[in-house]
Curated annotation (Swiss-Prot):
This is 4-hydroxy-3-methylbut-2-enyl diphosphate reductase. InterPro entries: LytB/IspH. It comes from Prochlorococcus marinus (strain MIT 9303). One of its GO terms (biological process) is terpenoid biosynthetic process. The active site is at residue 187.
């Protein structure tokens, strides 16, 4: 499929909207009530520090809603205001935050059912309104909805769209897209649908396996077994790893994406030499500014003298998970929670250790003075962070 031609056609359709409805003022009070926090504003004004009795809270200097998330949520609210009685569907969670998605359900926004990773669009009819979430949607989903006569409201983050443009450039120039991301993540699924030939690598270890194969150090059968579900149809590592372009899922760890880019540049330089390098390697900066800011703020926060760190965000949120990884890399006691209700009145916390199931830890707050660092993923409202802080205040108010 010529994805660029399809997008041009879709963008000119009267049933496609990616700019909202000019109703920002009408929904502003609803958004403020649901997601903003005067307490968080006060803490920001106080140097990101709150002192309350024996509790000191230190906030990261960049956390919570990014502008892409704010835009997507606002557009969803505007959509319901603009279509007060129509059936409205959304192809996935608008963002990875349970409270925000629950608010949409309360507004009678319907979620497309998926089973085994396959979405069932049979429920969607001609004239229905369908919201595409901040992560985007695959080009095949867009085509299906367009052909079905739906009103498409596209809240895809512009940073995600930028990555789509990048992999389309790779395709046009007959380069294979190496996508640093999680194979089953909605954003990576969408990005790969706009690519031609592609291979998804999760981390630096997987990237090294690919680099080794390029340099003749791998076994084809083992390689294909490892990446069978992470590559385009009919992928041939002997042919398709000769010309590479690097892109990424925008919420991945910035430092790792950069290292993967440098790894493949060195690999292609070693194989083809400096004169031929540009014929075999392309690199574009597809790292989201907001992701980078939150990760840098986290690196600063973990340099503070902290007793523990609370990371707030959906358990399926990639950018939140990477914030947790930063805390772990510094050896700081850290707890990833998705809602304030994970903190119990008995000083227990139900959290998700990295790569593990939920776990309840008792007496997680120590006696005496306690310094708690707090950050949150790009899909977490300030109001949720406020409620977490209030829980900590209640537990330390002896």
């Amino acid at each position: 499929m010529d994805t660029q031609a399809f997008k041009r056609s879709l963008h000119h359709s009267e049933r496609y909207n990616r700019r909202g409805f000019g109703r920002a003022n009408e929904v502003a009070s609803n958004l403020e009530k649901a997601y903003q926090s005067s307490l968080i504003g006060s803490i920001r004004d106080n140097g990101y520090v709150l002192q309350h009795g024996r509790l000191q809270v230190k906030l990261a200097e960049a956390f919570g809603f990014c502008w892409g998330v704010e835009r997507a949520v606002a557009m969803a609210y505007e959509t319901r205001r603009h279509y007060p009685s129509e059936r409205i569907w959304i192809t996935n969670e608008i963002i990875h935050n349970p409270s925000v998605n629950e608010h949409l359900r309360e507004m009678d926004v319907l979620f497309i059912h998926a089973e085994g990773g396959v979405k069932d669009f049979s429920c969607v009819s001609d004239g229905d309104v369908v919201i595409l979430p901040a992560f985007g949607a695959t080009v095949q989903e867009m085509e299906l909805l367009h052909e079905r006569g739906c009103h498409i409201i596209d809240t895809t983050c512009p940073w995600v769209s930028k990555v789509w443009h990048t992999v389309e450039k790779h395709k046009k120039q007959e380069f294979t897209s190496i996508i640093h991301g999680k194979v089953k993540h909605e954003e990576t699924l969408a990005t790969s649908s706009f690519a031609g030939t592609y291979l998804v690598v999760l981390d630096l270890d997987e990237a090294q396996l690919v680099a080794d194969y390029i340099l003749g150090q791998g076994d084809r059968a083992a390689f294909m077994k490892r990446f069978a579900k992470a590559c385009s149809a009919n992928f041939d590592p002997d042919q398709d790893l000769q010309r590479l372009g690097v892109a990424n899922q925008t919420t991945m760890l910035k430092s790792e994406t950069e290292e993967i880019g440098r790894l493949f540049e060195r690999t292609m330089l070693r194989k083809y030499g400096p004169i031929e390098l540009n014929k075999h390697f392309l690199s574009f900066n597809t790292i989201c500014d907001a992701t980078e800011e939150r990760q840098q703020a986290m690196f600063s926060l973990v340099d503070e003298p902290l007793d523990l760190l609370v990371v707030i965000g959906g358990f399926n949120s990639s950018n939140t998970t990477h914030l947790q990884e930063i805390a772990i890399s510094r050896g700081i006691r850290s707890f990833h929670i998705d809602t304030p209700e994970r903190i119990g009145d008995n000083n227990s916390i139900q959290h998700k250790p990295l790569g593990e199931d939920l776990f309840i830890e008792s007496n997680f707050l120590p006696a005496g003075s306690v310094n708690v660092g707090i950050t949150s993923g790009a899909s977490t409202p300030d109001r949720v962070v406020e409620h977490v802080i209030q829980k900590l205040i209640d537990l330390t108010s002896d």
